[in-house]
Structures are given as C-alpha cells and as structure tokens.
Amino acid sequence: MSEVYHLYRPGLKTRLIFSIGILAVLALWITAMYIVFGGEKFGIFMGIFAVYFAPGFGKESLIPIMTAVGCPLAAIVSGIVILDMTLAILISFNFDLLLKIPGIGHALRYATDKSATTLHDHPWVKGLAGTGLFLFMYIPFMGSSAIITTIIGRLLAVHPKILLPIIFSGSLCATLTVAVGVKAVIALWFANPWYAVIAVIVTAIVIVILWKLWQKFIAPRFAKDTK
C-alpha cells in the first residue's frame, strides 16, 4: 500500500487555507472553553481531551470520562468533532510533508500500515465506497479514528472534498450516539442501578449480535479485493 504516499499533493495555497483555517477553529474553541469554564475546569477538560490523541483512547472511553467530570454535552460533541476534523484536514492536505517530520512521520507510517491491514480485514469498506467509510468512522469498536479513516480514504484515492464531509458526519453521529447513550445510562443509574446494568448488558448483546449478522450475511456481499 505504498501508493498512499504519492496520492493528492495540493498546492501551497490550498494547504495554507485549510490548515490555518482548521487550526484557527481549534484555537477559537479552546478560547471559548476557557472563557466559559475558567481555570480549574478548563485545565481538567483540556487534559482529558488531550488523552484522545493517545493510542487506545477513543470516543467510547473519552466520553464517559468527560461526562463523569461534568463536561456539558455540547462541549464534548464540539470538542471531539473539531479534534477529528483537525487531524483529518491536516493529514489530508499535508500528508507528504508530515511524513518528513521526525516522530510524526514514523507515527503516520505506522498508521498507514495499520490502515492497509484494516482495509484488508474489512474489504466491505472499499465495496461500499463513501458509505463504507462513514460506517467505519461511525462504528467505535472497529478501531476506527479520524486518522485511520483519513488514510484509508487516501488508499482508496478519495478526494478530500468527498472524504472530509464523510469524516465530519461520521464523527458527529458517533459522538452523539455515545454521548446520548452515556447520558441515558447515568439517568438510569440514578433511578435504579440495576436498570443501568441491564441496559448496558442488553445493548452490548444487541451490538454483538448485529455485528455478527453483518459480518456473516451483509459485509461479504460488498467485499472487494483490496490487493
């Protein structure tokens, strides 16, 4: 999958517009968080959001923590979506340049190898094209992330003008789904802890059953050779 390194190299103007634009949005969001929450809460929230960049931490682990420390739903959703879009845009428009930066380049090469493996393991992503990328971004327990989804998009030669809206919608829907689910479980817990436990178990069972049915009956119909 080395061809990913040679796909889509935009001009300098395009790189600057999109890169500076999304970094400005990120800076405005951080400033707004500081104005709204002040010093102590701001430090706690930003520290937890920073963990989102660490391997193994996704929406399904970050959102419950953010909810537990009292972060409002709007801040959680906006923060995760902006972080996802920041990563997606920077990688989409600067992939070849980022590869040359020590540390970052090594991490991107590792992510590219992981993306190629993921695409091989889930060929339906290619078969379903844009819908496949959306589903991959949306389903949290597949090991998906903005980084992996963006690189898979490059592997499939999907232009950023198509890929970025897919990542945005997938990130927004996934974040809202997890956040609303966590809020519902917390509400059930305060009503009766057993309700919350039963709800989590039933939800987990339903998800596993649906995933198994998808793998067995639906995904093979859309699988395409990724070699």
Predicted features and spans:
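Membrane-interfacial helix-loop-helix
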Residues: M1-M46, L73-I139, A184-K227
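Residue-level hotspots within the lipid-embedded alpha helices of multi-pass solute transporters
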Residues: Y52, D84-M85, Y138-M142, S171
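Hydrophobic alpha-helical interface/terminus motif in multipass membrane transporters
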Residues: I65-M66, L98, I152, G181, ...
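Transmembrane alpha-helical segments of integral membrane proteins
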Residues: A146-I151, C173-A184
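Transmembrane helix boundary and interhelical junction motifs in multipass membrane proteins
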Residues: G47-A74, P140-T150
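Membrane-embedded alpha-helical segments of transport systems
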Residues: F57, I82-L90, F168-A179
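Membrane-interface alpha-helices at helix entry/exit sites of multi-pass transporters
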Residues: A74-V81, L155-G170
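Membrane-helix boundary/interface segments in integral membrane proteins
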Residues: L23, A27, P123-K126, A146-K161
